[in-house]
Amino acid sequence: MAVAALFVSAISLWVAIRTEQANEELVAASTWPFLQVQVSNADPDAKLDLQFQVVNTGVGPAKVESFELFWKGKPYTSSATLLAACCSYREVKATSPEAKSHTPLLKGTVQGIVLRAGEAETFIRYRLGDDNLAVWSALDKAREQMRYRICYCSVLDQCWKSELQAELYFRGQLHPEEVKSCPIPSVAYIK
């Protein structure tokens, strides 16, 4: 009788441990974020509008710990410096006389934000206007040579680092590297 009780206790303990592991895996799966970069050159109204976004296509929120943008292998800290390098962009001050006829470059930040599942954050937006055809066309072409590195964590502090580009066929894009914590980049993209 004692042997049977010991056997039942051992099986109960094994079942409890397996149930706990299954529950932990279920919670992790139900809070899993997955970040991707999406780039488009037209808005829903078919207006020519370059938009660069980080999108959370996972099921849980993502805490974006670091974000880096590279063009031709060189890191950039802002969209203005990137466009100056790739596309001969010249920033116009809002107080200058030519500002009224100047198509603005809209900038955003990704690092340090929390993206809910299904949410997107735009970090560059540049509409085609009467004054910027050459710069806009150069940026549309340069986006093919852009790469991104992003590190993000779930609400359970599971973290991943991804090397991305806008085209989804980029090798490894669907398999981010799991990391213990996100490294601090030497040159982070800020805005």
Where are these regions (language model features)?
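Surface-exposed beta-strand edges and their flanking turn/coil or helix-capping segments
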Residues: L50-F52, F67, Y76-S79, W136-A138, ...
